[in-house]
């Protein structure tokens, strides 16, 4: 202890770690979600949104959910059974489309209910099934740490899962 300060070694909580900083632009950052793990993609997109960027996520039906197919289906079906005894409108909203499911995952990683900055960040988000014409010409990015590492047979595509729980294209 020198001069009233505690000297701590640089560790996990220090600010010396390398973090990717993306500069705010007028054009949206387009993320191609093909073969990305859902949670890792959502956390990376949430960070970009909180930095003040506009983000568009394309190909939401090709996002991968980790875990066995049967477990993913079972968890989604159990979630669909949650509702209110008195009135079904009082229960949670059950999204079945891949783009709205992904938008909800990202929203849950933002301070949506606690801070106005979270709501503003969520308004800068756009999610799409496929790739719309106006976005096809823009450069698309991918997050290396969010890509799947094993073969695709170890994951379930979000589009496939949504078709099973009731999404009709």
Predicted regions and their residues:
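Ribosome-associated RNA-binding proteins
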Residues: 2-169
């Amino acid at each position: 202890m020198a001069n009233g300060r505690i000297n701590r070694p640089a560790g996990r909580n220090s600010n010396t770690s390398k973090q990717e900083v993306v500069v705010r632009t007028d054009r949206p950052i387009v993320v191609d979600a093909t073969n990305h793990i859902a949670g890792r993609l959502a956390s990376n997109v949430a960070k970009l949104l909180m930095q003040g960027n506009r983000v568009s996520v394309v190909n939401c039906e090709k996002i991968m959910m980790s875990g066995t197919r049967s477990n993913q289906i079972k968890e989604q079906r159990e979630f669909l059974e949650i509702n209110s005894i008195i009135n079904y409108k009082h229960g949670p909203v059950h999204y079945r489309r891949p783009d709205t499911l992904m938008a909800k995952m990202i929203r849950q990683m933002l301070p949506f209910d606690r801070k106005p900055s979270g709501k503003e960040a969520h308004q800068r988000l756009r999610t799409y099934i496929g790739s719309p014409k106006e976005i096809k010409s823009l450069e698309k990015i991918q997050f290396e740490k969010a890509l799947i590492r094993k073969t695709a047979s170890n994951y379930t595509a979000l589009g496939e899962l949504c078709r099973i729980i009731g999404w009709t294209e």
